[in-house]
Amino acid sequence: MLWSVLRHILWVALLLLVLSLLGFVILLRDPLNANLVTQNIYIGYFHYLGTLLQGDFGITYNGGKSLMNLILTVLPPTLELCFITLFLAFIFGLPLGIISAVNSEQVFAKSLQILSYVGLSIPIFWLAPILLYVAALSHWEIAAIGQYNLLYEIKSITGFPVIDMWFMEVPYRTKIVQNILQHLALPTLVLCILPTMEIIRIIHQRAEYILNQNFSKVATTRGWSKWKILHQYVFRNTFPLLVPQVPRVFTLVLTQCMLVETALGWPGIGRWLINAVNEQDYNSIAAGVIVIGVCIILIDTFTKIFTFILDPFKKKGWYAK
C-alpha cells in the first residue's frame, strides 16, 4: 500500500508541475515578462516555480494589485456556488434517478429520461440570460447581481457570506439570510440543471441494471417489498459508484460557473478570469489557471481517499504491487 500511496503522491506532483509549466508559458505571452528568460529559460522557470511555492503569484497588469489577495477574494464566491449546486444536484438527482429506474416503463420515467438528455444538451450561456429575462418579466423576488445587497455589511470570516452571516450579532439577520438566498437562487437554478440531469442518468442506468439482476428478481419472488430491495441491493450497489464521478461533475459545474458568473454578475473567479482575458492580463490568467487546476486536483484526491474508505474493492488497486 505504501508504494501505491507514493505513486499517487508522485502523480499529483506531476500534475502540479504540468500546471506550473502551463502557467509559465501563459506568463511568457506578456512582453513585460520577457526578463524571465533573458539568461536561460530553465533558470526563469525555476525562479517562477520558487515564487509559486512561496505563494506569490505576482501582481495584476492593470492596477498592480496582489494576485494572491485577489484570488482569495474571488475564489470563495465560485466555490460557494459550486458546492451549493452540487449539494442540490445530489438532493434532487438521487431520488429522481431511483424513481425513474423503479418505474422505468411508466410515462413519468420515460419523460424524465428524455428530459435528462435534453438538459445535458442545453447551452448554459443561452439559458442564463433567458431565465434572467423570464424572472424580470414574472417579477420573481430574486436578485441577479452580486452575492448580497451592499447595504448589508457582512464581515468576511470564511469568505462565504452564507456562512459568515451566522457569526453576526445583528437584529436584521433574517433579512440578510433572505437577501443572500435571493441572490443565490438564479445562478444556482441555472447551474443545477446540468449536474442534476447527469446524476439522474448515472443513477438510473446503475439502479436499472441492479434491478434486472437475478438476485433482485429472486427477492421479488420471495415477497420482498420494493423498499427492502432498494435498501438491500440498489442503494448499496449504486451510491458508492457515484462517488468517483464527483470530480467530473465538479469540473463540469466549475466550467459552467465561469459562464454563469459573467451572465449574472456573480463576483467569482470565472468572471475575473474572463475580464483578465479581455484585458490581456497574462499574470492573472496564469494564476487563475493554476488555482482552478489545484482545486480540481484536490477534489479528485479527496474523492479517491473517500472511495478507498467506502468501497472495499478499490483497496485492491491500492494494495497492488
Swiss-Prot record:
Q: Which Pfam family is one of those matched by this entry?
A: BPD_transp_1
Q: Which UniProt keywords apply?
A: Cell inner membrane, Cell membrane, Membrane, Peptide transport, Protein transport, Transmembrane, Transmembrane helix, Transport
Example GO BP: protein transport
* Location of the protein in the cell: Cell inner membrane
What the entry lists under InterPro entries is as follows: MetI-like (IPR000515), MetI-like_sf (IPR035906)
Name the PROSITE patterns on file.
ABC_TM1
- What cellular-component terms does GO give this entry? plasma membrane
The record gives the membrane topology as: Multi-pass membrane protein
Q: What does this protein do?
A: Involved in a peptide intake transport system that plays a role in the resistance to antimicrobial peptides.
Q: What name is this protein filed under?
A: Peptide transport system permease protein SapB
